[in-house]
Amino acid sequence: MLPRHSDPIVAIATAPGRGAVGIVRVSGKQIGALVQALCGRALKPREATYLPFRDAAGQAIDQGLALYFPAPHSYTGEDVLELQAHGGPVVLQLLLARCLEAAQGLLPRLRLAEPGEFTERAFLNDKIDLAQAEAIADLIDASTEAAARGASRSLSGDFSREIHTLRDALVHLRMLVEATLDFPEEEIDFLRKADASGQLSNLKRSLARVMQRASQGALLREGIKVVIAGQPNAGKSSLLNALAGAELAIVTPIAGTTRDKVQQTIQIEGVPLHVIDTAGLRESDDEVERIGIARAWDEIAGADAVLFLHDLTRWGSAQYQDDDAAIAHTLSNRLPAGVPVVDVWNKADAAPQAAAPAREGESQAVLLSARTGQGLDTLRRQLLQIAGWQSAAEGVYIARARHIEALRAVDAHLMEAAAQLESDGPALDLLAEELRLAQNALNTITGEFTSDDLLGVIFSSFCIGK
């Protein structure tokens, strides 16, 4: 353990601001003397004790609960003391200062914790693995109920157990191949007898299932960015308001009302969609409007999906069609390959006999009225399909981009391993190396093989006191 990880640490563990309860947390080795100094008595482990909190002069700071968790049966795996007082910021700062003051003659190395350091201690002391540690932050940051439930499953170890199952199968296959390397005269019969090819195929199928569930979990965590674009007065702000179920953007019949982006995160079946309303796209002499249009194109360039809004009531105008075609051409040039564009034909209520016109190259289209809500459910289903959401089935766990990247690396190494195994006269040393690299990639998910730099990035994103 690095030197800083042996220091006792203290921090306010509750969120900034006022609340009914606030917590000051201390973690370290052999903090019993500090517990005695702060509480005026020894505490019975894992039981709440109601008592006064006093400063060094014996003056009352507050009264509340103290809980002592001796190592190793604590959150961090070290001795942990929690002081639960009233949740005013001044009270908590006084308690924090009292902890540091009382430690001067007892725990002179006691210091303020860095962000995420309590959870980092839990990881380093084998209380949780890295995927579970990340799930704590994901649970705190969850923006939807589905994301919170998925993070809870990861925290309880569902994702980690899947990874361990894959790793165990991989280790068994590695043992088989590497043992064969020690007895080259028997290599072909030995591999066939043990059905190494069948084991590898089963492993690849299991990996595919984990990747599918992980990708769904990553979607719950990250969501997708959806940009609404189109000519002025096509109904972009009305569509944002309709999707959000609230009057977020100003709606007027005056073209060019929206000068800057308006963003709102909505959820459909628990999937967060970051929807952005943008300025109407057109040529303009107004400097402020031109800035808004430039920002609109910047947002479009970074979109995961674009809703290209058309006004059905103006589609009979040749000029309107030409302007729409010019926007479509610019979209095709500016958007990265593979970013879907949904043609949304708005104001269907004002043109009840109209059907969605067919545009050249159009692959997806929705006919709707942002004012009445007609067609909104169809658009929502279309957005879920674009996002890649398959169902709201139980069992999805939260995964991060780095987890997906690691699983893809495992898949690539297993593909190479399969190619070696299926070739005439397989190169067993190359096969063994691919399996080793696959295992290393798996281990980075749970933290069994992870660089200190990555740990620093992960835990620094936590709040102080967690």
From Swiss-Prot:
(6S)-5-formyl-5,6,7,8-tetrahydrofolate binds at residues 25, 82, 127, 466. Keywords: Cytoplasm, GTP-binding, Hydrolase, Magnesium, Metal-binding, Nucleotide-binding, Potassium, tRNA processing. GTP binds at residues 233-238, 252-258, 277-280, 346-349, 369-371. GO terms for molecular function: GTP binding; GTPase activity; metal ion binding. GO terms for cellular component: cytosol. Its EC number is 3.6.-.-. It holds the Pfam family MnmE_helical. This is tRNA modification GTPase MnmE. It comes from Acidovorax sp. (strain JS42).
